[in-house]
């Protein structure tokens, strides 16, 4: 693959099904690709949840879904100054990209104008920062509006394969997601799209999802591991092992060797003690907390990166010297408490 030869679906399936006892050999091969394209750098991304919960969509995996009984934070749009404060704390912690996220099917034109104003103010104060927006399914002209205000990237995950999609969501279709990614890319936004693993997908469905992402040209691929929130249809769904998670990440690297590969939601819960090894395959993480659950402390993230011999893209951050259930986020955006940054 270093010579430019692309991995086939059959080859990817063989690698995904390889003997778990030999995972270190798989990891070493994936690490060579990671090193060739990204050296020893790790990109830190920071999430700001602009609007939490009360989503009309019925995605089975999501704590913000229609009918969710998960005891998450629920709030409408943050004030612009509060969102910027949250984002700047992420930058101070070492993040080079801030991801502004809002729950819902997709934004109204008024919502896009609101985010455009926020991003404009944020970029004026922090011109070096990258901004990714994640607002749901886009309508005509909205991607262009976001691009014009300074948004650099747009996230809209495929989450799973087209074949499995109707099992995890009935309120919109797989094509709604692919069309949004295509629209973002056509508008000049960097396409960020990934998946969620551990939802009961078959090996073939997982491979199909990865190849769909490659065909879309996703430049940043977040790999989320299912958070089985109580109060959602997938509560108590535990189908992954740490080694299986590493195998999935390795295959993702082989399928898209030049893409930013991010270990994303629930990495702490599923990779557990093998989490540091994942940095030899992935070159990006979310710093601190997720949308509705807490991550490990920012200090632990920075220490893990430094201890592994990696460097952060933003040199301002440095590591300090010297249960598995999801923890509901009760700090940061939408609260009076300081964020985990």
Curated annotation (Swiss-Prot):
UniProt-listed HAMAP family: BioB (MF_01694)
Keywords annotated in UniProt: 2Fe-2S, 4Fe-4S, Biotin biosynthesis, Iron, Iron-sulfur, Metal-binding, S-adenosyl-L-methionine, Transferase
Gene giving rise to this polypeptide: bioB
Residues that coordinate or bind [4Fe-4S] cluster: 55, 59, 62
Keyword Protein biosynthesis: no
Ligand binding ([2Fe-2S] cluster): 99, 132, 192, 262
GO BP: any one term: biotin biosynthetic process
Segments of this protein annotated with the region Disordered: 317-341
Biological pathway: Cofactor biosynthesis; biotin biosynthesis; biotin from 7,8-diaminononanoate: step 2/2
Quaternary data: Homodimer.
Function: Catalyzes the conversion of dethiobiotin (DTB) to biotin by the insertion of a sulfur atom into dethiobiotin via a radical-based mechanism.
Annotated organism of origin: Renibacterium salmoninarum (strain ATCC 33209 / DSM 20767 / JCM 11484 / NBRC 15589 / NCIMB 2235)
The protein's name: Biotin synthase
Radical SAM core domain residues: 40-264
Reactions that this protein is recorded to catalyse: (4R,5S)-dethiobiotin + (sulfur carrier)-SH + 2 reduced [2Fe-2S]-[ferredoxin] + 2 S-adenosyl-L-methionine = (sulfur carrier)-H + biotin + 2 5'-deoxyadenosine + 2 L-methionine + 2 oxidized [2Fe-2S]-[ferredoxin]
Note on cofactor: Binds 1 [4Fe-4S] cluster. The cluster is coordinated with 3 cysteines and an exchangeable S-adenosyl-L-methionine.
Sample GO molecular function, one term: iron ion binding
């Amino acid at each position: 693959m270093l010579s430019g030869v692309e991995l086939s679906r059959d080859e990817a399936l063989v690698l995904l099904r390889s003997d778990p006892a030999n995972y270190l050999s798989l990891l070493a091969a994936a690490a060579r690709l990671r090193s060739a394209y990204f050296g020893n750098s790790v990109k830190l991304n920071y999430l700001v949840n602009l609007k939490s919960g009360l989503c009309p969509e019925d995605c089975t995996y999501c704590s913000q879904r229609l009918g969710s009984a998960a005891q998450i934070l629920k709030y409408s749009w943050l004030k612009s100054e509060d969102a910027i404060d949250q984002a700047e704390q992420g930058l101070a912690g070492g993040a080079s990209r801030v991801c502004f996220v809002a729950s819902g099917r997709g934004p109204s034109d008024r919502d896009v104008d609101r985010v455009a104003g926020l991003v404009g103010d944020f970029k004026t104060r922090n011109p070096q920062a990258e901004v990714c927006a994640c607002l749901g399914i886009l309508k005509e002209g909205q991607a262009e509006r976001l691009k014009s205000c300074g948004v650099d990237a747009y996230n809209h995950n495929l989450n799973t394969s087209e074949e499995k999609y109707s099992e995890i969501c009935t309120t919109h279709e797989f094509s709604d997601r692919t069309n949004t990614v295509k629209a973002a890319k056509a508008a000049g936004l960097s396409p960020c799209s990934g998946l969620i693993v551990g939802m009961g997908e078959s090996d073939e469905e997982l491979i199909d999802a990865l190849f769909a992402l490659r065909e879309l040209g996703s430049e940043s691929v977040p790999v989320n591991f299912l958070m089985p929130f109580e109060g959602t249809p997938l509560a108590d769904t535990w189908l992954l092992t740490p080694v299986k998670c590493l195998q999935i990440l390795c295959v993702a690297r082989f399928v898209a060797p030049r893409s930013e590969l991010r270990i994303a939601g629930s990495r702490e819960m599923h990779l557990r003690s093998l989490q540091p090894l994942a940095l030899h395959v992935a070159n990006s993480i979310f710093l601190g907390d997720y949308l509705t659950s807490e991550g490990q402390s920012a200090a632990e993230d920075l220490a893990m990166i430094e201890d592994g011999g990696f460097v952060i893209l933003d040199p301002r951050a440095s590591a300090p010297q010297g249960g598995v259930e999801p923890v509901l986020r009760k700090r940061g955006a939408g609260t009076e408490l300081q964020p985990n940054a």
